[in-house]
C-alpha cells in the first residue's frame, strides 16, 4: 500500500490536485511568498472570490480556513488558511498551526476532495522555524488521515530541497514512505 502522504519539491501552483492550500494573510488579498505566487497564477478570479469572502465574513483569523474556486490553476479549489506568526513559541503558535492544518483538511473532507497540497505554512515571512513547523504539519496530517478516509492523498510541497528532505525524514521516522 502506498503512503497517503507524499513530499514533493516544486511549485505548488503547478499541481493538478483537488485543493491547493494557500498560506494566506488575514486580509486574503494576496501578499508575498506562496500567497503571492498562488494569486498571480490563479488570476483575478481568485482575488474576486477572496474579496467576496471578506465582504461576507471579514478577515480570516489565525488558524481558520476558507475555500474559493481556483481560478486559472489546475486545482479545483484553493483553501486559504492563516498560520501563526512565530513569537518565540510561547504564544500558542503550535496549537494555531495545528488548527490551520486541521481546518484545511476538514474543508477538503467536507468537499469530498481526494487530494490536497500543503505548502510549509508560516515558515516564510511569519518566521516559524521550519523543523518545528514540519513536525506540527506531519503530526497533524498523520493524525487526521487515521480518522478520515478523505483526502486520500496529501502532498507536502516544499519549495527547496532542504525542506523536502526535512519532511521526508519526518515521514520516514513515523513509518511512512514519503516517495
Swiss-Prot record:
Ligand binding (substrate): 11-12, 25, 33-35, 122-126
Pfam families registered for this protein in UniProt: Macro (PF01661)
Entries under Gene3D superfamilies matching the protein: Leucine Aminopeptidase, subunit E, domain 1
Documented EC number(s): 3.1.1.106
InterPro entries reported for this sequence: Macro_dom (IPR002589), Macro_dom-like (IPR043472), O-Ac-ADP-ribose_deAcase (IPR024900)
UniProt keywords, alphabetically: Hydrolase
Reactions accelerated catalytically: 3''-O-acetyl-ADP-D-ribose + H2O = ADP-D-ribose + acetate + H(+); 2''-O-acetyl-ADP-D-ribose + H2O = ADP-D-ribose + acetate + H(+)
GO molecular function: O-acetyl-ADP-ribose deacetylase activity; purine nucleoside binding; ribonuclease inhibitor activity
Active site annotation, chain numbering: 35
Any GO BP: purine nucleoside metabolic process
SMART domains: A1pp
Membrane spanning residue stretches: none
Coiled coil, from the record: none
The keyword Transmembrane belongs to this UniProt entry's keyword annotation: no
Keyword check for Mitochondrion: no
Residue ranges annotated for the Macro domain, each copy included: 1-175
Subunit structure as annotated in this protein's UniProt entry: Homodimer. Interacts with RNase III.
Function: Deacetylates O-acetyl-ADP ribose to yield ADP-ribose and free acetate. Down-regulates ribonuclease 3 (RNase III) activity. Acts by interacting directly with the region of the ribonuclease that is required for dimerization/activation.
Family affiliation: Belongs to the MacroD-type family. YmdB subfamily.
The protein, known as: O-acetyl-ADP-ribose deacetylase
The organism of origin for this protein: Salmonella typhimurium (strain LT2 / SGSC1412 / ATCC 700720)
